[in-house]
Amino acid sequence: MICTHDTSIYYAARLAGTSLIHRLDRDAHFRPFFDLRIRDGVMRASHASWDCVDMSGRFTDAWILLRQMMDWPVTEEESGVREYLLAGQSTEDGLFYDCGVRIADCGLGEHPSPQPSPSRGEGVDRADMFCQSRALLGLTSWFLESGDIEIEERIEMLADGLWEIAAKKDDFCYYLGHRYSPDGWTGVSAYTAKEMGPTALPAYGVLQILPLTRYWEATRSPAAERLILGLLNFLVRESGIIREDGGFNGHLHSWGILPSTVGVLRYAMATGRDELIPWCRRVYDFIVSRSSSFGWVPDGIGVDDGITTGETCCITDLIHLGVKLAECGHDECLDFVEVMARNQLPESQIRDTSRFEFESPEVETMTLGAYDSWVMPNGLTGCSELGLEGCCTASAVRAAYLAWKHAISHSSGEVRVNLMLSRRSEWLDTASYQPFEGRFDIVVRKPVRIAVRIPKWIAKPSVTMDGQPISPRVAGGWLRIEDARPGSRIELRFPIPERRTEEEIGGRTYRLSWRGITLMKIEPPGEIYPIFQRNLESMAELNAVPLDTLKTHPSVEW
């Protein structure tokens, strides 16, 4: 039997971070490539307007969060992307513009005005409301890591600029379109969109409340809070997007619905708005009920005649929502969080480039470690005309960070082991041996009370401390140990049942083979890049990050 603790989630995150390093145009001041797409049978890299703000914000965030988990230096590439991101902010209105300001007209460290640059050939500058949230994501993590006053000032300037262009009515606000320029808006007003249905994207800019709330938690910024409250009140009370039962029709991530819900929950938790927590829980339950048993999450629900692919960004948002709901006492949400972290999240990554032909060796290095944006339940690149969008690779790093960060928590002298993942902390270290064997080890660092969440699929485990059997108290799904001493080793043992099931997803029936909650095989396999064709030997090879190289606690909290 293979005996190894599982650190594959960190291997995948490190590989993704390296992929992002390669996914930059060094002839264009480290501009990211948004697209890795199969055209005429060949994987090619290409630019899109999403490079400018969305990708540079997400890449910045991803590398910072990767650095929380493991040793990861600030590279030349990260510094270049940061400069590229900052260069997109207007000094006049504080907004981040997608086009015309950076490639030919400025070098690194220069901060141009938002005038169109004909040399870019991409049309007029636009400040996309979705992309403002991704700039905020990167800037907020940057500020939390560094405390840099300049970054704080830039976030304040952006919050002021967004408030200035927002339409206000009573105690809520909204945007008059999807993309703004000094010459006017394009797209549909969010207030009008609520009467037109979900395809008009009434939540497109509302997801700004997630990074704004995290920034507000750290600073209590009045500029951030007024915008948060205005957008939150629009989403929850005025937009009509979310039904009473938590259901909705729309794309989860790209239409802003799911990340906006995470923002609502974070603000509710920070301000004692407890009445909003059940609202967020209903959204979570609705999405989980439309997802697969192994953590495949649909890109959209109730649109486009049924979505049969999933986007990695949706998994990240749902993990975030699940771990924060657990902090509110909804511990049962962690079961599906762990399912996603063990299954669909790692399997959505390209780790075998031999399956593709590439435009160049450089494109191959970009592809290794990239995450898919059109994931079929049984294979990647489910929409061959589209492909591996840069947002998903950066989001996958964020998902790994969220699982790592929330796997262990501490409150009132008690350490809670929320997820059965391998992790180090200042209080104790954990080592998970799934799916190789039913074993979970805890090495105590400090004298603390310990509570271990026991997932529903595990019957009461046998427990030893320093080799001696003990009978800890088990209640409400938690196993509690009161008398652990520094240096003690606690071992939980339990059977890993093997089973086979059938499941219909998107109108197609799949046959599934499991070890515990780890999906080993799915049939029929996908065509272009089959996934879930696992065996224990190949999975052991992914445990290439030694546990003792992981960090014990983050300086950046999400």
Regions found by a protein language model. Name each.
Residues 1-10, 66-82, 142-159, 215-229, ...:
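Structural helix-adjacent loops and short alpha-helical linkers that scaffold large soluble proteins
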Residues 458-483, 500-505:
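Solvent-exposed beta-strand/loop surfaces of large extracellular or lumenal domains
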Residues 29-50, 96-111, 123-131, 174-207, ...:
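Carbohydrate-binding/catalytic loop surfaces
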Residues 269-289, 305-353:
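Catalytic-core region of carbohydrate-active enzymes that cleave or remodel glycosidic bonds
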Residues 17, 280, 334-438, 474, ...:
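C-terminal beta-rich recognition modules with glycine/proline-rich loops and embedded aromatic residues
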Residues 443-456:
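Surface-exposed beta-strand/loop patches in extracellular or lumenal glycoproteins
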Residues 49-68, 78, 126-144, 197-217, ...:
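Well-ordered alpha-helical segments within folded domains of soluble proteins
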Residues 1-58, 65, 69-102, 107-109, ...:
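Low-complexity, Ser/Thr/Pro/Gly-enriched N-terminal "stalk/linker" regions
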